Curated annotation (Swiss-Prot):
Catalytic activity from the UniProt record: ATP + H2O + 4 H(+)(in) = ADP + phosphate + 5 H(+)(out)
Residue ranges of the TM segments: none
Primary location: membrane
Intrachain S-S bonds: none
Originating species: Pseudomonas aeruginosa (strain ATCC 15692 / DSM 22644 / CIP 104116 / JCM 14847 / LMG 12228 / 1C / PRS 101 / PAO1)
Protein name, as recorded: ATP synthase subunit beta
Pfam families: ATP-synt_ab, ATP-synt_ab_N, ATP-synt_VA_C
PANTHER family: ATP SYNTHASE, ATP SYNTHASE SUBUNIT BETA, MITOCHONDRIAL
EC numbers, comma separated: 7.1.2.2
Lineage of the organism: Bacteria, Pseudomonadati, Pseudomonadota, Gammaproteobacteria, Pseudomonadales
Gene field: atpD
GO CC terms in record: plasma membrane; proton-transporting ATP synthase complex
Length: 458
C-alpha cells in the first residue's frame, strides 16, 4: 500500500506519481484521498508515474492531491445479495435500498475459462417470439447479438426476451446497462418489478451520462456477477445493452491514453478489448451463461468496425431492419439477414429446418419480384408467382407479434408462442392451408388459430 500524488489530469485520464519502488500494477484500483473517486491503472509511464482512468467524475480533482494504492483490482459484490438490486460499476447500490450486504466480492478482471473447462451443447432456448424461434433459434449457453440502428426496437426486444425467459425459464439474469438512456434503465426496472421477476435479476448500470471509465468497465462488473452464478452451477442469462457503447467508451479514452487511432477513429485495441469481454462469456462444465447483447449499428452500416468485430464472437445474429419497421411489422427482425449456428437439421430437426428455409425462400423470391411488380404491376406475374407473393405477404405479417412489454403502447395483450405452434403455423401457410384467408388476419397475432379467428371478424 503506497501513496502518490496527481501530476496531470486530462479529462477522464489521470497521471499519478508514486515512489519508484512502490509503483502500483496494471488494473490496480487507486483511491483519491478526501474524494469518493476510484482510479484504475492502465499504463506505467516510467519514473514512477502511472496513467489511470477515473471510475467517476473528475470534478473537484486537482494536481497535488494524494492518492492511495489499494493493492488489488476493482472488486464488486457477487452472489444472491445482488438480485433485485441496482448497482454501479464499483458495485455500490444506487437504488436507495440500503447496503448490498454481500458475503463475497470478486475482482472484475478474471481469466476466461480454460479450453478444458468449457462445455459445448446444442440445447435450444425457446423465446416465445415466432420470428426468432423460427429463423435464428438461440442455443442455451450461446451468444446472441441484436443488431439495429437507432430506434428500430433493440431495447424493447431485449426487455421482451428477459420477461419471457425469466417467467418461462425461471433462471437468474444479470442486466448490464452500458451507456444507454437512463430513462430506459428506469423503465426497465419498473417493467421487471411489474412482471414480478425483479428478485431474479441483478442490474448494473453505467449509463450515457457517466464518464467513459464507468462505461468501459460496467460490462465487466455485470459479467463478474454472472460468472459467480454460473460457477454455483446455474444457467444464467447475461443481457448487455449496448455493446457498442462499450467500444465507444474505449474509443473515448484511447486517444487520451496516447494511442494512435485506427480505422474510422476506433481504438487500435478494438479486437482485443472485445475478445477479453466475449471470451469470458462462456459455458463451463459447472453451469452456463447465455448472453444476449444489443449492438447499435452506426448509420445502419453493418461493416462498421465495431459491429463487424462483434459478429465474429456470436452464435446467432438477430438483425433489426428499418425497412421492416417502416411497414409497421414489429418485432422488425429481418428473416433473411438474421442467422444462427443452430439452424441445422441435426440440431433443430428436419421439420423445423425445412419450414425455416421454406419461409426464407418465399420471402427472398418475393424480394426479387418486387422490382417487376413496381414496374409492371401484379398482373404481369405468372399464376405461380402470384400465389407465392400472396403467401409471402401473409408470412411477412405473421412474423409480427404483440409484445407483453409493449402492451402500454399497443393496447393489445402480449403473446407467447411455443416453438411447436410457430412451426405448425408457418408450415400451414407454406402448404397453402390458409390461402383463403385475407393477409390482414395474420398481422399482430400469436398462433395461427388466432389468425383464423381474426379472419372471421374481418
Amino acid at each position: 500500500m503506497s501513496s502518490g500524488r496527481i501530476v496531470q489530469i486530462i479529462g477522464a485520464v489521470i497521471d499519478v506519481e508514486f515512489p519508484r519502488d512502490a509503483v502500483p500494477s496494471i488494473y490496480e484500483a487507486l483511491k483519491v484521498q478526501g474524494v469518493e473517486t476510484t482510479l484504475e491503472v492502465q499504463q506505467q509511464l516510467g519514473d514512477g508515474v502511472v496513467r489511470s482512468i477515473a471510475m467517476g467524475s473528475t470534478e473537484g480533482l486537482k494536481r497535488g492531491l494524494n492518492v492511495d494504492s489499494t493493492g488489488a483490482a476493482i472488486s464488486v459484490p457477487v452472489g444472491k445479495a445482488t438480485l433485485g438490486r441496482i448497482m454501479d460499476v464499483l458495485g455500490n447500490p444506487i437504488d436507495e435500498a440500503g447496503p448490498i450486504g454481500e458475503e463475497e466480492r470478486w475482482g472484475i478482471h478474471r481469466e476466461a475459462p480454460s479450453y478444458a473447462d468449457q462445455a459445448g451443447g446444442n440445447e435450444l432456448l425457446e423465446t416465445g417470439i415466432k420470428v426468432i424461434d423460427l429463423v435464428c433459434p438461440f442455443a442455451k449457453g450461446g451468444k446472441v447479438g441484436l443488431f439495429g440502428g437507432a430506434g428500430v426496437g433493440k431495447t424493447v426486444n431485449m426487455m421482451e426476451l428477459i420477461r419471457n425467459i425469466a417467467i418461462e425459464h425461471s433462471g437468474y439474469s444479470v442486466f448490464a446497462g452500458v451507456g444507454e438512456r437512463t430513462r430506459e434503465g428506469n423503465d426497465f426496472y419498473h417493467e421487471m418489478k411489474d412482471s414480478n421477476v425483479l428478485d431474479k435479476v441483478a442490474l448494473v448500470y453505467g449509463q450515457m451520462n457517466e464518464p467513459p471509465g464507468n462505461r468501459l468497465r460496467v460490462a465487466l462488473t455485470g459479467l463478474t456477477m454472472a460468472e459467480k452464478f454460473r460457477d454455483e452451477g446455474r444457467d444464467v442469462l447475461l443481457f448487455i445493452d449496448n455493446i457498442y457503447r462499450y467500444t465507444l467508451a474505449g474509443t473515448e479514452v484511447s486517444a487520451l491514453l496516447g494511442r494512435m487511432p485506427s480505422a474510422v477513429g476506433y481504438q487500435p485495441t478494438l479486437a482485443e478489448e472485445m475478445g477479453v469481454l466475449q471470451e469470458r462469456i462462456t459455458s463451463t462444465k459447472k453451469g452456463s451463461i447465455t448472453s444476449i447483447q444489443a449492438v447499435y449499428v452506426p448509420a445502419d452500416d453493418l461493416t462498421d468496425p465495431s459491429p463487424a468485430t462483434t459478429f465474429a464472437h456470436l452464435d446467432a445474429t438477430v438483425v433489426l431492419s428499418r425497412d421492416i419497421a417502416s411497414l409497421g411489422i414489429y418485432p422488425a427482425v429481418d428473416p433473411l439477414d438474421s442467422t444462427s449456428r443452430q439452424l441445422d437439421p441435426l440440431v433443430i430437426g428436419q421439420d423445423h429446418y425445412d419450414t425455416a428455409r421454406g419461409v426464407q425462400y418465399v420471402l427472398q423470391r418475393y424480394k426479387e419480384l418486387k422490382d417487376i411488380i413496381a414496374i409492371l404491376g401484379m398482373d404481369e406475374l405468372s399464376e405461380a408467382d402470384k400465389l407465392l407473393v400472396a403467401r409471402a405477404r401473409k408470412i411477412q405479417r405473421f412474423l409480427s407479434q404483440p409484445f407483453f412489454v409493449a402492451e402500454v403502447f399497443t393496447g393489445s395483450p402480449g403473446k407467447y408462442v411455443s416453438l411447436k405452434d410457430t412451426i405448425a403455423g408457418f408450415k400451414g401457410i407454406l402448404n397453402g392451408d390458409y390461402d383463403h384467408l385475407p393477409e390482414q388476419a395474420f398481422y399482430m397475432v400469436g398462433g395461427i388459430e388466432e389468425a383464423v379467428e381474426k379472419a372471421k371478424k374481418l
